Amino acid sequence: MGACRIQYILLVFLLIASHWTLVQNIYCEVSRTLSLEDNPSGTFNWTSKAEKCNPGEFCQETVLLIKAEGTKTAILASKSCVPQGAETMTFVQYTAPPGLVAISYSNYCNDSLCNNRNNLASILQAPEPTATSNMSGARHCPTCLALEPCSSAPSMPCANGTTQCYHGKIELSGGGMDSVVHVKGCTTAIGCRLMAKMESVGPMTVKETCSYQSFLHPRMAEIGASWMPTSLWVLELLLPALSLPLIYFP
């Protein structure tokens, strides 16, 4: 009888300990960043302060990077506690070089201070500079990245392989962000597809609006055009399985 009572007490203790582990508060790094950087892979410091989260919350870190050749790189980054999610690490390239490049990284995790990435060196693998011989002298586009409309953007030559001049803006909200980036430049995307029609990046909602001038159809211009993606690949790390499936959308 005594042995059974001891086993019962141990079982209750284990259940209480397990429940406490599931609902305990964790600490997460918290920050919001909107900036334009010359060399984000080498100079951007993503170190953040820590805050205690509510019971059951996860940590997250998300960054969206947009780059135009010959300009700075726009960085929109968020670290915070989030009320729900699954432990997942995701890298997405929405638009590939040459021309405008848009990529994102997002990490959801469930350990204290697990959203502790402090730089972008392993996230932003800068494409090789396009050789002058690969530039098409007949194709030029106004090119800029700015936090406000850039009406006087300089006209720059486009690399072979680009398909149109892009002129638009990316609006992000949620995850502590409420920001707009204005984008102009040559691109390989078709239509209004710098973000490949994706509507969220981590906890942030994305809205893309644009006009564009196709090199094949110069008079084509559309706001919020709907096209199928030309290049989008997702590298997803599901923890703790540590599997790395690669998904490609032709």
Curated annotation (Swiss-Prot):
Keyword presence, RNA-binding: no
Signal peptide: 1-25
Posttranslational modification: N-glycosylated; by high mannose and/or biantennary complex and/or certain types of hybrid oligosaccharides; possesses different oligosaccharides chains according to its subcellular localization in the testis.
Residues bearing a lipid moiety (GPI-anchor amidated glycine): G224
Residue ranges that the Swiss-Prot or TrEMBL entry lists as coiled coil: none
Membrane-topology descriptor: Lipid-anchor; GPI-anchor
Claim: Chaperone is one of the keywords in the record: no
Residue span(s) of domain UPAR/Ly6: 141-215
Sugar-modified residues: N45, N110, N134, N160
Swiss-Prot/TrEMBL GO biological process terms: basophil activation; binding of sperm to zona pellucida; fertilization; flagellated sperm motility; regulation of cytosolic calcium ion concentration; regulation of flagellated sperm motility
Swiss-Prot/TrEMBL keywords: Cell membrane, Cytoplasmic vesicle, Glycoprotein, GPI-anchor, Lipoprotein, Membrane, Secreted, Signal
Tissues in which the UniProt entry reports expression: Detected in testis.
Propeptide part(s) removed at maturation, as residue ranges: 225-250
InterPro entries: Fert-Immune_med_protein, LY6_UPA_recep-like
GO cellular component, one term: acrosomal vesicle
Subcellular location: Cell membrane; Membrane raft; Cytoplasmic vesicle, Secretory vesicle, Acrosome; Secreted
Oligomeric form and interacting partners: Interacts with VAMP3. Interacts with LY6K. Interacts with DPEP3; co-localized on the cell surface of spermatocytes, spermatids, and testicular spermatozoa, co-localized only in cytoplasmic droplets of caput and corpus epididymal sperm. Interacts with ADAM5.
Function summary: Plays a role in fertilization by controlling binding of sperm to zona pellucida and migration of spermatozoa into the oviduct. May play a role in signal transduction and promote protein tyrosine phosphorylation.
Protein name in UniProt: Testis-expressed protein 101
Protein encoded by which gene: Tex101
